[in-house]
Amino acid sequence: MGKITIAPLTRLEGHGKVTIKLDDSGKPADVKLHITALRGFEQFVIGRPAEEVPRIVPRICGICQTAHHLASVKAVDAAWGAQIPSAAEKQRELMHLGNMIHSHALHFYYLAAPDFVLGPDADPAIRNIVGVIDAAPEVAKKAIAMRRVGQSMVEATGGKPIHPVTGIPGGLSKSMSEEKRDELLAEIDTMIQYGQDGLDLMKSLNEKYLDTINSLGVIDTWYLGLVKDGKHNFYGDTLRFVSPDGSEKMEFKPAEYLDYLGEHVVEHSYVKYPYNKKVGYPEGLYRVGPLAMINVCDSMSTPLAEEARKEFAETFGRPANQSIAYNQARLIELLSACERAKELLEDPEIVSTDVKAEVEPKAGNGVGVVYAPRGTLFHNYETDDNGIVTKANMIVATTHNVPTMEKAIQQAAEVLFKDN
């Protein structure tokens, strides 16, 4: 029996490797995805004042730091019973959308586009963002502009473009200025157009690679995402599971997550394998992220993105089970984030200074959930009478997807090795 090891994995926000064990006929018998880094943040925050934690946990991820900041502060809000002013909620949401715009542009154009724009058979030495810049400079310029504007939104609302600091229990420590609002409004229509341009690019590439999209990494799983009144929502208040064939839905609130999510320990990875507890392991394995969000929602919350979602469903089905379709789903979300950001920037409350409610530290248990760029993100803290964290649980977005990524790699390997 032979073995193929791919290490390190590239274009990965972290560290990992893949091992493929081959049977005597040279076909893949077993595939393992190893996540080889131990983080430890659940232990780091124990003994800390809870109000400090939203400034610690952004270090979990250099790309999704804003999502961790906001999920964390929402968890502390819930533990202490804070009632957040409407203006603070809107400014927090804009901060979150800025991170989504920045990260979704990075993920598609920097990590995925080299394979589509240059082709999967291109020399690996040029199959990267530098190669995209050489081959399609206008595409690269738009990607860079979207990242810049997204980061400017985070800075305007979060105080810093990297590791924001304004989220505090009860709201925000500062509000966005009218000057920053006006600067962002002047650019947002261009970002919406760039979002549409990205979708047009992806749809043209789909025609070339549709056979590959429909054959590699196609697996049946459950899907988990956030909705608000059934609509797609990055900052939503309701979690929804959808079954592999779309026939069954389960909805629950963040505080109920332990009733619905279980975690299975495997020997070959530091990551625990989450699953739908109502279904069991492994039948209840599920996916999160753009594909899942498109699959679980009844509709998008913005008009241009909703038209794109309908077209997506016609192309890939509903629910879509093709892993490579994550890329088009991500671009639909990128467009939606730009549309929603415009709505918020035109709302007078986006520059209101009423962004802080009084809140006192106390004993409590709170869960904060947001949709991070890679998928649904959970932070759960318990605090004592002095507001000190005594217990913490975090399920980061990529963790949900690790077991199903392993399944998708297994399926892709079987297809690729079928004819040796």
From Swiss-Prot:
Keyword Metal-binding appears in the UniProt entry:
yes
Q: Where does Ni(2+) bind?
A: 61, 64
Task: Please report a single Pfam family linked to this protein.
Answer: NiFeSe_Hases
Cofactor field = Ni(2+)
Question: What Gene Ontology molecular-function terms does this entry list?
Answer: ferredoxin hydrogenase activity; nickel cation binding
| SS bonds (residue pairs) | none
- Keywords attached to this entry: Metal-binding, Nickel, Oxidoreductase
Q: What is its EC number?
A: 1.12.99.-
- Stretch forming the signal peptide: none
Q: Which domain of life is it from?
A: Archaea
Family, similarity comment: Belongs to the [NiFe]/[NiFeSe] hydrogenase large subunit family.
* Subunit: The F420-non-reducing hydrogenase vhu is composed of four subunits; VhuA, VhuD, VhuG and VhuU.
Q: What else is known?
A: The large subunit of Vhu is split into VhuA and VhuU. Each contributes two ligands to the [NiFeSe] center.
What name is this protein filed under? F420-non-reducing hydrogenase vhu subunit A
The encoding gene: vhuA
